From Swiss-Prot:
Pfam families: CbiA, GATase_3. SUPFAM superfamilies: Class I glutamine amidotransferase-like, P-loop containing nucleoside triphosphate hydrolases. Residues 251-446 form the GATase cobBQ-type domain. One of its GO terms (biological process) is cobalamin biosynthetic process. Belongs to the CobB/CobQ family. CobQ subfamily. Catalyzes amidations at positions B, D, E, and G on adenosylcobyrinic A,C-diamide. NH(2) groups are provided by glutamine, and one molecule of ATP is hydrogenolyzed for each amidation. GO terms for molecular function: ABC-type vitamin B12 transporter activity; catalytic activity. Keywords: Cobalamin biosynthesis, Glutamine amidotransferase. The active site is at C332 (nucleophile), H438. It comes from Clostridium botulinum (strain Eklund 17B / Type B). Pathway: Cofactor biosynthesis; adenosylcobalamin biosynthesis. This is Cobyric acid synthase.
Length: 501
């Protein structure tokens, strides 16, 4: 079979392109096509580390999982991670440069060939590629340097499906306006439209769809309902990241500090799915209250977020709660914040050369330009205070950080990797702990023991033995649900005809 492809472009950002690409990927995979996703450029702080230590955007990880594939950085050759006044540029999984935002156009011209090369390598492995654009596809001020939208479609000769979001309003104008801003050749590449996030009865919308088709002379291939799919989000601007109070008094209260540059918030997806666990994201002292555990997550700008914590008085409140017995846990940047001091003599994060930490752990962190990105197998080597059954539990996760932390005398190892290297410590009493390991709660035995210890401390009912096994199956069930709803509401046969399969 000849290599085939199709590309989903959007009328704007956040119209649902990533989700619809994942949906089509699972539909085609279920029909036994060798399909893979591709997005030239992603802008996100929520990244993933592949088995070979390459960094890529989460959206393509989700799409790879929908294809039942191991994620590969070829699927997302360029990842931009904004941080303060500059952006870290990841190319083919490795740090390429740090640039000011006004240099994007110049950067894109340099990377155009790399993007095409990555696509070609991926295309040689699979019979069908489903591409995703970035943001809106008709940004005329960016058109000359575009490498992620219509220019990408043209370079690989991909037919285009235009995606629009009706929930934000003005869907007809956004579709017509987008097409109007495309050139004649670009517009001829658009073979269909999908209207996403529809609420209400479709029969009341049919007349509008017919009128739209008469105006644009392009078929509307489907109207996707506004439906909740519990799959990982690319960006932190999501309904999941909120301070949601539990209605169940018998639930464990997990307060995650919502940092301004919070990254890898997918670390906590499993926790949010466990019955009897309430996960809240807190950004002010008003809402911190008295949780069972406080977690300081990862961040793209540790020092700046630490300063914001201090200015907001959240830092003082975290220390106060710790002193009164609340367990505090830090992950990656949050781990660094728990230490005595953070040193940035090379200006990796910005212009602040050093900043005092919260002082809860006897560690000192020094930032350097070399970025550590690797998947890790590890083991918990110490229990924590009132968390007595996590020692010797196995962990699988990943590291992604610039800082190196020197361990002092007043802490003990909490987590070691398979080579015996310390990648997390706790204080002698076990009342505060931190680690560089992302994804620790994805390890079922550890999470089961951790949550049950908290439940036991509160005299709550413990988790069922198969509770977390159900969670493991849950993700695949969500992909199947997505594929089913896509197939029921979108003309998949027409899409296959457009692709040529």
């Amino acid at each position: 079979m000849n290599k085939k492809n199709i590309m989903f472009l959007g009328t704007a950002s956040s119209v649902g392109k990533s989700t619809l690409v994942a949906a089509l990927c699972r539909v085609l995979k279920n029909e036994e096509f060798k399909v893979a996703p591709f997005k030239a450029m992603n802008i996100s702080l929520n990244s993933y580390v592949t088995k070979d230590g390459a960094e890529m955007g989460r959206a393509q990880v989700v799409q790879a999982e929908a294809c039942k594939l191991e994620p590969n950085a070829l699927m997302n050759p360029i990842l931009l991670k904004p941080s303060g006044g500059h952006t870290q540029v990841i190319v083919n999984g490795k740090v390429y440069d740090n640039i000011e935002p006004y240099k994007y156009k110049e950067l894109n011209k340099k990377l155009k060939g790399i993007v095409k090369e990555s696509y070609d390598k991926l295309s040689n492995k699979y019979e069908l590629i489903v591409l995703e654009g970035s943001g809106g596809c008709a940004e005329i001020n960016l058109k000359d340097s575009d490498i992620a939208n219509m220019n990408m479609a043209e370079s690989v000769d991909a037919p285009v499906i235009l995606v629009a979001d009706i929930d934000r309003g003005g869907v007809f104008a956004s579709i017509v306006g987008t097409l109007e801003l495309l050139s004649k050749n670009e517009r001829s590449r658009v073979k269909g439209v999908i209207i996403n996030k529809f609420r209400g009865e479709k029969q009341h919308f049919e007349a509008g769809v017919k009128q739209l088709e008469e105006i644009i002379k392009i078929p509307v291939l489907g109207v996707m309902p506004y439906e909740y799919f519990d799959i990982e989000d690319e960006d932190a601007v999501t309904e999941k990241i909120c301070n949601k109070e539990s209605e169940d008094e018998n639930s464990i209260d997990v307060a995650i500090i919502r940092l301004s540059h919070m990254s890898n918030f997918t670390d906590f997806n499993v926790l949010s799915r466990i019955n009897g666990v309430n996960v809240r994201y807190v950004e002010s002292t008003k809402y911190l209250k008295n949780p069972d555990v406080i977690i300081i997550p990862g961040t793209k700008n540790t020092i700046e977020d630490l300063r914001i914590l201090k200015e907001s008085k959240l830092a003082d409140e975290i220390i106060k709660l710790h002193d009164s017995g609340t367990l505090v846990l830090g992950i990656c940047g949050g781990y660094q914040m728990l230490g005595k001091i953070l040193l940035d003599q090379q200006g990796v994060e910005g212009n602040t050369l050093q900043e005092e930490g919260l002082g809860l752990l006897d560690i000192k962190t020094r930032f350097n330009e070399r970025k550590i990105t690797k998947q890790v197998e590890a083991q918990v080597v110490s229990n924590l205070k009132d968390i007595n059954e996590i020692e010797n539990k196995s962990l699988v996760g990943y590291e992604i950080h610039n800082g190196i932390s020197k361990v002092g005398k007043n802490v003990k190892p909490f987590i070691k990797d398979s080579k015996g290297k310390i990648i997390g410590v706790c204080d002698i009493e076990g009342s505060v702990a931190g680690t560089y390991l992302h994804g620790i709660f994805d390890s079922e035995e550890f999470t089961n023991a951790f949550i049950n210890a908290l439940k036991k401390n509160n005299n709550f009912d413990l988790l069922e033995d198969d509770e977390l096994n159900k969670i493991s199956d849950y993700k695949n069930e969500q992909y199947e649900k997505l594929a089913k709803i896509f197939s029921e509401n979108v003309d998949v046969d027409k899409i296959k005809e457009i692709i040529g399969i």
